[in-house]
Amino acid sequence: MSIGEVDPLERLRQICLALPEVTERLSHGEPTWFVRGKKTFVTYADHHHDERLAFWCAAPAGAQAAMVAADPERFFRPPYYGVRGWLGVYLDVPNVDWAEIEDIVADAYAQIANKR
């Protein structure tokens, strides 16, 4: 990583841990973020099923299909969680839009945190 480049894991960690009642622990060998210590809302995917760096997150109904159709270079249907509508977001693309990722993570958090 060159000077000035953002470490994707560290930036994602900052975004997730800034939200209320969020904790981090390893799940299936990957950093994963939980709401109130129980429900996963984001999991890091460091070359989990392919050669890509990404994260998987909860998403509002219909968001996965719309985002993957609109930009398959940046978004995908993740294994395991994709069937539940979760969204995969590639972090190894040029010019990662961290403001957009903050919004995606906030939406993921809301999907899980609002379920009590």
Model regions: which residues?
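Charge-dense, helix-prone N-terminal extensions
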Residues: 1-116
